[in-house]
Amino acid sequence: MASQLTDAFARKFYYLRLSITDVCNFRCTYCLPDGYKPSGVTNKGFLTVDEIRRVTRAFASLGTEKVRLTGGEPSLRRDFTDIIAAVRENDAIRQIAVTTNGYRLERDVANWRDAGLTGINVSVDSLDARQFHAITGQDKFNQVMAGIDAAFEAGFEKVKVNTVLMRDVNHHQLDTFLNWIQHRPIQLRFIELMETGEGIELFRKHHISGQVLRDELLRRGWIHQLRQRSDGPAQVFCHPDYAGEIGLIMPYEKDFCATCNRLRVSSIGKLHLCLFGEGGVNLRDLLEDDTQQQALEARISAALREKKQTHFLHQNNTGITQNLSYIGG
């Protein structure tokens, strides 16, 4: 095995977020309010199963322990189960997760688990069916809820739910969410609304700091848990009276980037050192053949020397991220 991926600031990288498509069938107000618009990349232009196998093999050799499959909506790929199985071939990768809108969860989650999936994140921004429809553009609330139930029935001991925190939309619904997770092993993760190139006005109107929720959780006796090295950026809180947990992802908080442990590869094979960074390092020309793995690992390691210490969101610099479907949020 090559040496562990480490940047100039001594941060070690155990976590790969791999986008496999930028296509999505939902029209979430904070991501794709006008729906998916092809950018010239057809379905045939996204990474193939073999390319995914090669890129995850290289990252596994460089110390990656966790891979999250993202999009767009990853389950829209017909070969999604094959993709899970391809990542699963790497013994060094202990966790394989997906972030999904839940559209196909009820139908397919058992097959995904059989293929090797170990974790699920489902996007649910409201527990009110009408508001869910208004936010996502899809009247699929009951279908998504049934999918979460199906995940538990398939054997997943915990399901993570992502909720984008928005002022005057859902920030006042904490009690509703807490009631939902009281007897369910769900880690509900409130994610601060982030500014993107296409979402400046939405951000100005609806952004609210997760600090508001954190203060309220602490007031109610919730306890801050320690992070594991391959965990994502959430600050996780537990309470003895609840089966579920609360996570807070606050990218505008001081020192948010200090614990960064993740890298991103887009659905067309570009390595992104930060969700809000500029450009990207092309890897695709080194994904054509198994014999290129050493060169691929070298390019990944070399690119890491250019990773910045922090993002520049506080300066209203969102980098290349025009919307969150592009490199998987």
Curated annotation (Swiss-Prot):
EC top class named in words: lyase
InterPro entries given in the database record: Aldolase_TIM, Elp3/MiaA/NifB-like_rSAM, MoaA, MoaA_NifB_PqqE_Fe-S-bd_CS, MoaA_twitch, MoCo_biosynth_MoaA/MoaC, rSAM
GO biological process: Mo-molybdopterin cofactor biosynthetic process
Residues the record lists as binding GTP: 17, 68, 99, 160, 262-264
Subunit composition and interactions: Monomer and homodimer.
Cofactor binding remark: Binds 2 [4Fe-4S] clusters. Binds 1 [4Fe-4S] cluster coordinated with 3 cysteines and an exchangeable S-adenosyl-L-methionine and 1 [4Fe-4S] cluster coordinated with 3 cysteines and the GTP-derived substrate.
Family named by the database record: Belongs to the radical SAM superfamily. MoaA family.
Catalysed reaction, written as an equation: GTP + AH2 + S-adenosyl-L-methionine = (8S)-3',8-cyclo-7,8-dihydroguanosine 5'-triphosphate + 5'-deoxyadenosine + L-methionine + A + H(+)
Binding site for [4Fe-4S] cluster 1: 24, 28, 31
Keywords: 4Fe-4S, GTP-binding, Iron, Iron-sulfur, Lyase, Metal-binding, Molybdenum cofactor biosynthesis, Nucleotide-binding, S-adenosyl-L-methionine
EC numbers on record: 4.1.99.22
Binding site for S-adenosyl-L-methionine: 30, 72, 123, 194
Role summary: Catalyzes the cyclization of GTP to (8S)-3',8-cyclo-7,8-dihydroguanosine 5'-triphosphate.
Superkingdom field: Bacteria
GO MF entries: 4 iron, 4 sulfur cluster binding; cyclic pyranopterin monophosphate synthase activity; GTP 3',8'-cyclase activity; GTP binding; metal ion binding; S-adenosyl-L-methionine binding
Pathway connected to this protein: Cofactor biosynthesis; molybdopterin biosynthesis
Name of the molecule in the record: GTP 3',8-cyclase
Binding site for [4Fe-4S] cluster 2: 257, 260, 274
Swiss-Prot/TrEMBL cofactor(s): [4Fe-4S] cluster
Domain Radical SAM core: from-to ranges: 8-234
